[in-house]
């Protein structure tokens, strides 16, 4: 089979959990945008250009209330600052992807990062091709689902209670899968423990960045200690 076709096939199979998650959350976003007075085209454009998931839901409130550009920018920075940590993991891969590098940085999300981490055993070139197609497919899922939700929201009333839990379910599934595939569980236990403490200290709206900083510091220190031994 053609290497690019094989990479696309592999990326599609790996992206199925993301598809299931993005389908419901993207539609929810489109419906909420429609309820706020924005048509399906606005949902499609925002998802294609902004593509930040959780922040897009916050953006609905900002757009409806006429928030300042500064407020929107600062909120976006804090809500998406964790992506800079994700990108560090794949810097060597992105550097080898030429003109696609900037798109890969733009399209790196929580979900694509988690799935990319499962591709580490592939040969470098195959891994990079698979990562690229995974990014494109995931971007398409989110954008298409947002537009579809905007269209359906115009004609069908929806009860959105509990729809956001599908994202939690996705991450629990990925966590369990990674736990079963690896023999060293210290990173997972460190991240889980720090996240629980940070949640208790900083609250649901402010725990993500501190948890990432502390977990990263622990893993860097542990890696240096292991290397010295």
Task: Kindly give the residue locations of the regions a language model identified.
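Alpha-helical transmembrane segments and their membrane-interface exit regions
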Residues: 51-54, 78-85, 170-176, 195-197, ...
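Juxtamembrane membrane-interface segments at transmembrane alpha-helix termini
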Residues: 56-62, 85-90, 176-181, 199-208, ...
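Membrane-embedded alpha-helical modules
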Residues: 128-210, 221
């Amino acid at each position: 089979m053609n290497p690019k076709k094989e990479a696309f096939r592999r990326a599609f199979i790996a992206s199925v959990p993301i598809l299931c998650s993005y389908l419901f959350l993207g539609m929810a976003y489109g419906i909420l945008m429609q309820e706020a007075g924005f048509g399906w085209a606005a949902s499609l454009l925002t998802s294609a250009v902004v593509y930040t998931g959780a922040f897009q839901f916050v953006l609905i409130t900002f757009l409806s209330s006429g928030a300042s550009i500064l407020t929107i920018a600062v909120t976006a920075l804090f809500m998406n600052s964790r992506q800079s940590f994700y990108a560090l993991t794949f810097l060597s891969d992105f550097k080898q992807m030429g003109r696609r590098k900037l798109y890969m940085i733009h399209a790196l999300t929580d979900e694509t990062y988690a799935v990319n981490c499962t591709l580490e055993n592939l040969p470098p070139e195959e891994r990079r091709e698979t990562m690229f197609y995974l990014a494109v497919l995931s971007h398409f899922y989110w954008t298409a689902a947002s537009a579809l939700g905007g269209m359906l929201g115009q004609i069908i009333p929806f009860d959105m209670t509990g729809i956001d839990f599908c994202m939690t379910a996705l991450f629990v599934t990925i966590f369990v899968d990674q736990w079963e595939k690896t023999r060293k569980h210290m990173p997972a236990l460190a991240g889980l423990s720090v996240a629980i403490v940070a949640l208790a200290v900083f609250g649901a709206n402010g725990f993500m960045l501190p948890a990432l900083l502390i977990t990263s510091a622990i893993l860097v220190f542990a890696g240096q200690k292991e290397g010295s031994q």
